């Protein structure tokens, strides 16, 4: 097997379902993950945060004010708090202040109802899933569909959670080991915007690691001066010492200005031996690169498939999308076109 080849997956470009099929169902719910699997996703992505009793659950943030009905539960009114996490002060209800049993009494809701009103029709239909439940879903679906469906967990705010006595790295590794997924060829990637926890994880597991990068700012653990510095050829060589690939904001590859040309990031990452999985491809105008927007409102769906095809043409190895079926369609047409060109 060639170095770096993904034995578990049949395609050269991976479709990573961002929080599940979050363009069509409330994010980080079994509804969303199942929808993504049905639409052809290769991987489903749970962002992981801990409960008070140390159970890993899937929420984009530990503040669950916008993604659950917690505000309607009078028994939890006193849990409302203001906290500073990674330099950002926020008010709401936080997973680390609830036991798993308490969280399971809540119901998920759509985070962006103004942009995705159709998703709000599913409010109240799903609870907060645990990481173990998501692993079990991926295994059941793999057996039922006759194809491997992987998981792509993100460790959220690892330094913050360690600082309050709820470190997540060992819990994540233990769950993967229990699932039999502790090999470099397991259908798993672990991702983080921080650096030091990925370095720790490298010593704890053989699972492939992905260094996430934002278009601005720096890792919250202050392990690097900026994401921009990490994205230079020298920075990428340093990342390659502990990571299998990078997950950059797609604006780091195609700047978010009309008429932009792609940067050298993909070529530089590949030269360092890193795979490239950019985020996040969403259909709504507000999220698309400027050249792929269409007339209408911020919620109007633009030319997402054209955008994905362009990035596949640039050489990405996978991509995160809220709309896996559109990603699957774009990938199929891009690969068919490439195969046709190869006949010439």
Feature locations, PLM:
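Phosphate-group recognition and catalysis centered on beta-loop-alpha active-site segments
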Residues: 1-344
């Amino acid at each position: 097997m060639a170095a770096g080849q993904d034995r578990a997956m049949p395609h050269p470009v991976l479709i990573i379902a961002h929080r599940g099929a979050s363009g069509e169902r409330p994010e980080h719910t079994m509804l969303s993950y199942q929808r993504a699997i049905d639409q052809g996703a290769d991987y489903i992505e749970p962002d992981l945060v801990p409960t008070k009793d140390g159970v890993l659950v899937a929420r984009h943030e530990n503040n669950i004010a916008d993604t659950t009905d917690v505000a309607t539960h009078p028994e939890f009114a006193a849990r409302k708090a203001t906290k500073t996490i990674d330099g950002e002060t926020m008010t709401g209800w936080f997973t680390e202040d609830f036991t798993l049993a308490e969280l399971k009494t809540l119901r998920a809701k759509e985070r962006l109802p103004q942009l995705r009103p159709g998703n709000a029709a599913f409010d109240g239909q799903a609870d907060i899933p645990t990481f173990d439940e998501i692993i079990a879903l991926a295994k059941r679906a793999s057996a039922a569909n006759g194809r491997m469906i992987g998981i792509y967990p993100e460790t959220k705010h690892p330094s913050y959670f360690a600082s309050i006595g709820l470190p997540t790295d060992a819990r994540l590794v233990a769950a993967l080991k229990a699932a039999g997924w502790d090999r470099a060829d397991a259908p798993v990637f672990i991702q983080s915007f921080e650096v030091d926890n990925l370095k720790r994880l490298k010593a704890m597991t053989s699972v492939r690691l992905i260094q996430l990068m934002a278009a601005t700012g720096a890792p919250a653990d202050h392990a690097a001066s900026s994401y921009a510095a990490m994205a230079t050829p020298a920075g990428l060589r340093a990342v390659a010492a502990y990571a299998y690939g990078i997950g950059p904001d797609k604006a780091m590859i195609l700047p978010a200005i009309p008429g932009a040309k792609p940067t050298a990031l993909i070529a530089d990452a590949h030269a360092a031996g890193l795979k490239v999985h950019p985020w996040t491809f969403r259909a709504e105008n507000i999220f698309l690169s400027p050249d792929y927007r269409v007339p209408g409102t911020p919620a109007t769906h633009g030319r997402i498939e054209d955008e994905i095809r362009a990035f596949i043409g640039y050489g990405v190895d996978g991509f995160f999308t809220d709309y896996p079926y559109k990603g699957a369609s774009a990938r199929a047409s891009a690969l068919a076109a490439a195969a046709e060109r190869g006949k010439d």
